[in-house]
């Protein structure tokens, strides 16, 4: 009936059985951006935000979120991640967040990378909202994936 792997022949949702698949090296990178006022960005860069170390807290939040993805996203397998990295890059009025997740396993880590990036962005908002309530989170997307049946993919 459907080509979606999370639906059975009758259209009902189910968790995909990955038991028979071989374990392979897998990696996913995801990212997004949070735009803000110049003042808020300067405070974050200087470590002067009222709530403390914004980027350090956002990094830990992103890593924790990646580890909890199987609990947050229905039908997503709980995974034993080998590594998660959350990196930040400053722009003129924004911070770009890139999260990378990897493992050797039977299913991909795209959702873990996306969850890490989104929660890191949300944490930046939470930690800096006293400085700028009008911050805008945008462009959350998968940037790259490696491994598995579909091979290597890079966003255009």
Curated annotation (Swiss-Prot):
Keywords: Lyase, Molybdenum cofactor biosynthesis. One of its GO terms (molecular function) is cyclic pyranopterin monophosphate synthase activity. GO terms for biological process: Mo-molybdopterin cofactor biosynthetic process. It catalyses: (8S)-3',8-cyclo-7,8-dihydroguanosine 5'-triphosphate = cyclic pyranopterin phosphate + diphosphate. The keyword Transferase does not apply. Substrate binds at residues 75-77, 111-112. The active site is at residue 126. It comes from the Bacteria. Its EC number is 4.6.1.17. HAMAP family: MoaC_B. Catalyzes the conversion of (8S)-3',8-cyclo-7,8-dihydroguanosine 5'-triphosphate to cyclic pyranopterin monophosphate (cPMP). PANTHER family: CYCLIC PYRANOPTERIN MONOPHOSPHATE SYNTHASE (PTHR22960:SF29), MOLYBDOPTERIN COFACTOR SYNTHESIS PROTEIN A (PTHR22960). This is Cyclic pyranopterin monophosphate synthase.
């Amino acid at each position: 009936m459907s080509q979606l792997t999370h639906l059975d022949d009758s259209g009902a949702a189910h968790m995909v059985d990955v038991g028979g698949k071989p374990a392979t090296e897998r990696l996913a990178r995801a990212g997004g951006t949070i735009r803000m006022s110049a003042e808020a960005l300067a405070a974050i860069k200087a470590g002067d935000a009222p709530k403390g170390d914004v980027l350090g807290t956002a990094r830990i939040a992103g890593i924790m979120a990646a580890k909890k993805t199987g609990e947050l996203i229905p039908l997503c397998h709980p995974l034993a991640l080998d590594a998660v990295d959350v990196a930040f890059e400053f722009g003129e009025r924004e911070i770009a967040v890139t999260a990378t997740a990897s493992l050797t396993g039977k299913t991909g880590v795209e959702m873990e990378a996306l969850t890490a990036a989104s929660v890191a962005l949300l944490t930046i908002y939470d930690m800096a909202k006293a400085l700028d309530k009008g911050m805008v989170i945008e462009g959350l997307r998968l940037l790259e994936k490696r491994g598995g049946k579909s091979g290597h993919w890079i966003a255009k």
